[in-house]
Regions:
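Thiamine diphosphate
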Residues: 1-136
Length: 136
């Protein structure tokens, strides 16, 4: 109960601050070009942080949990990777004029977050951080 309350509080804080945390697969299927174009049109800027592990981790883990000895578990390629690699941040920049930045190393994250939030607050436009994680 306490953990759930804390989790809701964090979610509420992120929403009130205009921060969206999204996996790369969810980002692609959320029609990001429309999202960022509409945000620009209606002047509703937000910061979107994309967790980019290069594929669909949830379907992979679900399949392996249900069928650990199945044929797919032994396959070299499960077909859940994103190749060619999409330019997640570039989609938002092209469609909605968003500030776009790729964060390739953990040491860059803090300064990237500060710069992105400055753009959202000062320039009143969206910002997208494509945070690279270890691949699937």
């Amino acid at each position: 109960m306490v953990l759930e309350t804390r989790r809701r509080s964090l979610t509420t804080c992120l929403l009130l601050a205009g921060i969206c945390l999204t996996g790369d697969g969810s980002y692609l299927f959320s029609q990001p070009s429309v999202v960022h174009w509409m945000a620009r049109r209606y002047q509703t800027p937000f910061l979107q942080v994309i967790y980019d592990n290069g594929g669909w981790k949830s379907p992979k883990l679900s399949m392996l949990a249900l069928h650990p000895d199945g044929r797919a578990a032994k396959a070299r390629d499960l077909g859940v990777g994103f190749e060619p690699v999409p330019d997640h941040a570039g989609i938002a920049a092209a469609a909605g004029g968003a500030y776009a930045r790729v964060v390739a190393h953990p040491g860059e994250l803090e300064s990237a977050l500060e710069a992105a939030m400055d753009v959202v607050r000062r320039d009143r436009r969206c910002a997208v951080l494509d945070v690279k994680l270890p691949p699937l």
